[in-house]
Design a protein with these regions (language model features):
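Alpha-helix initiation/capping motif
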Residues: 1-6, 27, 36-38, 91, ...
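Active-site-facing alpha/beta catalytic cores
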Residues: 1-99
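Short loop/turn motifs at secondary-structure junctions
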Residues: 12-14, 107-108, 177, 247
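Residue-level signal for well-ordered alpha-helical segments
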Residues: 18, 36, 45, 49-52, ...
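Short coil/turn segments at secondary-structure junctions
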Residues: 52-59, 127, 219-226
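Glycine-rich phosphate/ribose-binding loops and adjacent secondary-structure elements
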Residues: 59-216
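Alpha/beta catalytic cores of nucleotide-metabolism and tRNA/nucleoside-modifying enzymes
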Residues: 131, 142-155, 165-304
Length: 304
C-alpha cells in the first residue's frame, strides 16, 4: 500500500479501478511475455526484466463481495481517490451480492465498468473472445437493473466498454444508463492498428502494441495524435448530433423510449421493452439533468 500511495502522489491519478475480469477473456487473468518486459516496464511494475509476468485471474486480497468491499474502502481511505471495479458479466450472483451489500450505504464502489464480451484483444483464445461473457447490452442492462430496482443506481457511476467507440453503440449505452464510455480498439485503429493479432509477441508490425523501439519508430506522434484527435472529435460530433435529433442536449439524456430495436423488416420494439426497463431508468437524476443542460448551454449548445 505504501507503493500505491507513492504512485498516486507522484502522478495525476484520478481514480483507481480494480480489474475483476475482461470482456475479451473473462476468467483467464493475463500474461505479459518477457519480451515485452523492458527496463521501463520492469521498474514501473516492480517485476524482473525479461521474465514472463503472469497475472492470476483472482485477487489474493479478497475472496467474495464482502471482503472486496472492505478492500475497496481501505484503498479509498489510503489514497483519497474514487475506487471502482471493472468486470465482464456472466453469472449474476456476484451482482446480486454486491447490490445487497451496498444498500445500507455503509460501503460501496464508486464506479462500475461493465466490459462487454465484444471487448477486444489480440491475445486471447478464440473461444473466450468469441463466446464467453454476455455482450455489452445484455450484461450492462442486467447489472444496471439490479441497482435501479434497489434504488441505488444514482450512487454509482456506470461506465461501458466493448465496441462502444462506434456512435450507434455508444448511444445505446448512454440510453441504458452508462454515464460514460471507454474507447480502446477504435483509438488504436485511428493510429494505425491493422489487427494483426500479434499484441502478445512484441512484434506488432505497425508499432502500436509493442515495446520494441525499432518497431515503435513507425509511429509518428505528431501525425498519429492528429488522427486520434480527429476520431474523438468526430465521435463527439456524431453523439451530439444524434442527441439533437432526439431533442436533448447531451447523449446522457437519451432514454430507452427514444430508441427502437428493429426485428427484421416487419416489426420493432423500444429499447425499454427489449431490456425490460421501467420508465425513468437509464437517465440521470433530475438534478443531474438540470446540471448537464446548464453545462451544455455554457459551451454553446442551445437547449433542445
Amino acid at each position: 500500500i505504501d507503493r500505491l500511495r507513492a504512485v498516486v502522489q507522484s502522478a495525476p491519478v484520478k481514480a483507481i479501478e480494480i480489474k475483476l475480469s475482461q470482456g475479451a477473456k473473462p476468467g483467464l487473468g493475463g500474461m505479459l511475455p518477457g519480451a515485452k518486459v523492458t527496463p521501463e516496464i520492469a521498474e514501473i511494475r516492480g517485476i524482473p526484466q525479461g521474465v514472463d509476468c503472469k497475472s492470476p485471474s483472482r485477487h489474493t486480497e479478497f475472496h467474495d463481495v464482502d471482503s472486496m468491499l472492505d478492500w475497496v474502502e481501505f484503498i479509498a481511505d489510503e489514497t483519497g481517490l474514487p475506487v471502482g471495479i471493472k468486470s465482464a458479466v456472466g453469472n449474476m450472483d456476484f451482482w446480486d451480492d454486491l447490490v445487497a451489500n451496498m444498500i445500507s450505504g455503509q460501503r460501496g464502489v464508486d464506479f462500475i465498468t461493465v466490459d462487454g464480451g465484444e471487448g477486444g484483444t489480440g491475445a486471447a483464445p478464440l473461444i473466450f473472445s468469441e463466446s464467453v461473457a454476455y455482450p455489452f447490452r445484455i450484461g450492462f442492462a442486467e447489472v444496471y437493473k439490479r441497482f435501479a430496482e434497489a434504488g441505488i443506481s444514482d450512487l454509482v457511476t456506470f461506465i461501458g466498454s466493448g465496441k462502444l467507440g462506434l456512435p450507434d453503440n455508444a448511444i445505446v449505452a448512454f440510453a441504458l444508463g452508462a454515464d460514460m464510455v471507454n474507447v480502446g480498439r477504435e483509438i488504436m485503429l485511428s493510429i494505425g492498428c491493422i489487427q494483426s493479432q500479434k499484441c502478445h509477441t512484441d512484434s506488432c508490425p505497425t508499432g502500436v502494441a509493442t515495446q520494441n523501439a525499432w518497431l515503435a519508430r513507425g509511429l509518428d506522434p505528431t501525425l498519429k495524435s492528429e488522427r486520434a484527435a480527429n476520431y474523438i472529435k468526430t465521435l463527439r460530433r456524431d453523439l451530439l448530433k444524434v442527441s439533437e435529433a432526439c431533442g436533448v442536449e447531451h447523449p446522457g439524456l437519451i432514454t430507452t423510449d427514444d430508441l427502437d430495436i428493429l426485428e427484421g423488416v416487419g416489426s420493432k420494439s423500444s429499447l425499454r421493452e427489449v431490456y425490460d426497463y421501467e420508465k425513468g431508468w437509464g437517465v440521470p437524476s433530475m438534478a443531474d439533468q438540470v446540471a448537464i443542460t446548464a453545462l451544455m448551454a455554457t459551451h454553446g449548445h442551445e437547449p433542445a
